[in-house]
UniProtKB/Swiss-Prot annotation:
Extent of Polar residues compositional bias: 12-25
Similarity comment: Belongs to the chlamydial CPn_0705/CT_671/TC_0042 family.
InterPro entries: DUF5421
Biological source species: Chlamydia pneumoniae (Chlamydophila pneumoniae)
Domain of life of the organism encoding this protein: Bacteria
Protein name: Uncharacterized protein CPn_0705/CP_0041/CPj0705/CpB0732
Region (Disordered): 1-83, 248-280
Pfam families, sorted: DUF5421 (PF17458)
Length: 280
């Protein structure tokens, strides 16, 4: 009897418990579930790698741009330095030989006046003799009004000083007399410098006179612009041969003059005869 009750009690208890479980709401899991996808992770990694690659590329481009700008700045700076160096060298050449000592105005003028003759006389004018002799020997001389004439324009060269560049050299020969003239200077300053070069080299003038004597020519006149240069006097030693040659030349010149005079007289008589004939 008690066993039956116990069995019924257990049955009823099971039934009750089962009923309770059925009537009660189902249990729910309130935990948040996160789904991890390997594909999403890989995509994020690729995006991160791509962004890092882009960042590196942009950084590299920026670095290259900065380097290019720096190179251009350095190149411009080097060109400016080179130009300044050239200008400085030109300035140094322009003032080569000049003293940078500060001198008062009056003292400076006196120093220039005192030093000028020394600087001028140091320039060699041997080229004048050379060009005159070569012209007399080799060039064809035109004849104008009974005088033989040569005119040269002096170009810039290593032998011609700057004071004579662009000037005209005129040689006029009349018989055995030769006249030398430098003209057509750029300005009065150039003419004055050229005149100083000639007058401060008397020994070379003497050499020119002697050289022309060897060509049976006498330097009669030497002028630079409107300045007439005083010629050195050279004593001529007369030898029997010189005297004979001088006598022969004198006779030839006299015969030539007589012949020209006779020709003029004959022409005059012939003209008067023709006029008389025409009148008749």
């Amino acid at each position: 009897m008690e066993l039956k009750k116990t069995a019924e009690s257990l049955y009823s208890a099971k039934t009750d418990n089962h009923t309770v479980y059925q009537n009660s709401p189902e249990p729910r899991d309130s935990r948040d579930v996160k789904v991890f996808s390997l594909e999403g992770k890989q995509t994020r990694q690729e995006k991160t790698t791509s962004s890092k690659g882009n960042t590196r590329t942009e950084s590299r481009k920026f670095a290259d741009e900065e380097k290019r700008v720096d190179d251009e700045i350095a190149e411009v700076g080097s060109k400016e330095e080179e130009q300044e160096s050239q200008e400085f060298c030109l300035a140094e050449n322009a003032f080569a030989g000049m003293s940078l000592i500060d001198i008062a105005a009056a003292g400076s003028a006196e120093a220039v006046v005192e030093v000028a003759p020394i600087a001028v006389s140091s320039i060699d004018t041997q080229w004048i003799e050379n060009i005159i002799l070569s012209t007399v020997e080799s060039m064809v001389i035109s004849e104008i009004n009974g005088e033989q004439l040569v005119e040269l324009v002096l170009d810039a060269s290593s032998s011609v000083p700057e004071a004579f560049v662009g000037a005209n050299l005129t040689l006029v020969q009349s018989g055995q007399d030769l006249s030398v003239k430098f003209s057509s200077f750029v300005d009065a300053t150039q003419m004055a410098e050229a005149a100083d070069l000639v007058t401060n080299n008397p020994s070379q003038l003497s050499s020119l006179v002697s050289a022309l004597k060897g060509h049976q020519l006498t330097l009669k006149e030497f002028s630079v612009g409107n300045l007439l240069v005083q010629l050195p006097k050279i004593e001529e030693v007369q030898t029997p041969l010189h005297m004979i040659a001088s006598t022969i030349r004198h006779r030839e010149e006299k015969d030539q003059r007589d012949q020209n005079q006779k020709q003029k007289q004959d022409d005059k008589e012939q003209d008067s005869y023709k006029i008389e004939e025409a009148r008749l």
